[in-house]
Amino acid sequence: MSYASVVDVLTGKVAVDETVTVRGWVRTRRDSKAGISFINLHDGSCFDAIQAVVPAELPNYSNEVQKLTTGCSVAITGVVVPSQGKGQSFELQATKVHVYGWVEDPDTYPMAPKRHSMEYLREYAHLRPRTNITGAVMRVRNALSQAIHRFFHEEGYLWVSTPIITTSDCEGAGEMFRVSTLDMLNIPKTDKGEVDYSEDFFGKEAFLTVSGQLNVESYACSLSKVYTFGPTFRAENSNTSRHLSEFWMVEPELAFATLDDVAGLAEAMLKYVFKAVLEERPDDMAFFAERINSDAISRLEAIVNNDFVHMDYTDAIEILKNCDRKFEYAVEWGVDLQSEHERYLAEEHVGAPIILKNYPRDIKAFYMRQNEDGKTVAAMDVLAPGIGEIIGGSAREERLDILDQRIDEMNLPKEEYGFYRDLRRYGTVPHAGFGLGFERLVAYVTGVQNIRDVIPFPRAPKSAEF
């Protein structure tokens, strides 16, 4: 028996008059007075379902085929023929229908064939991939992740698997999930009455990582061009459409590099992956342009075909202070820009992605390289129209004395960064990198407004279902 996916049949990879079996889930079933049934079957391989024309002559027609409802899983064997209907190139003339699984109560099936709100779908995260929108999001998510790996491979980067469990805080913000096997009802204490983490599994405090950057820097300082792509965690009590407690980060690191080098890398990567998703997922992108954001395709094309605008933080502050827009958050040199400021710059002032550079040192992380003016650091953010910050990066502080000064200023425990300081003691080298929040990238490409709808099982404050 020859099996085929829906996408292979619809794109002509299966020859006309060939008999194949397609397996998937029933979207709809319609019975005609002529004694045939039309079943729309999807398997997730593409946006469209395939139509199977099922004749009443099949032995299980009355007792099974006519009882099929949305969500039932089946295998339909049939002959591939040119479709007689509109909107589809090929269909199946069924010769056999095998039912794998029934929907026990069709009246209470959560994914009934109608339009559901995104909030409703979140309650059924285990079933929402069967909907048009979540299926399309996940195919685009896959295309983007594959394109990212392909881009870095073609550029000569090595993928490094950085640890999820860590003992250091990359961002220095303290918003970390603790990893512990201590008995919460019988916590060991030190002589000072503090928690005795020497009794814990790792013999010290351990956390879920907020970033793989510090670890991947170690490998950049030996292998030159590396990146990590994996899950990260923030115990930040932000219940917004832009925040997740568990999300994926893309973090390249490049030795012998400046801020401008990684700014160019970020631009090249975004153009590469946007071009890839437009070429590989035209069906899904057409859906997003029609139903979610009419600019979904055109704005990606604009990014692919135009240069990013480079702008200094100081210049951006002057632009924001002198514009006629009333912002909720006041603008002064030294403040961290809010989403409303970033989006104004990218959407209204420039109308294109911006690489914003050279931020005040006091609002940035300890590891960012201090500029000669002593007030700013060689940091950058990539601001995209429609979402704001999508990438953050910097040149790293390779001078041990200045790095130590920053660690002390931020009251960070220097002993926890011993391995990081060693990189500056043994053959230090200028290097730079950036971090891309992968879910924000997926949200930007698809036009989906809430970041919880672009990851399979979202984790957020008071929300860890499934």
UniProtKB/Swiss-Prot annotation:
It comes from the Bacteria. Its EC number is 6.1.1.22. It catalyses: tRNA(Asn) + L-asparagine + ATP = L-asparaginyl-tRNA(Asn) + AMP + diphosphate + H(+). It is found in: Cytoplasm. Keywords: Aminoacyl-tRNA synthetase, ATP-binding, Cytoplasm, Ligase, Nucleotide-binding, Protein biosynthesis. SUPFAM superfamilies: Class II aaRS and biotin synthetases, Nucleic acid-binding proteins. Homodimer. Belongs to the class-II aminoacyl-tRNA synthetase family. This is Asparagine--tRNA ligase. It comes from Idiomarina loihiensis (strain ATCC BAA-735 / DSM 15497 / L2-TR). The gene is asnS.
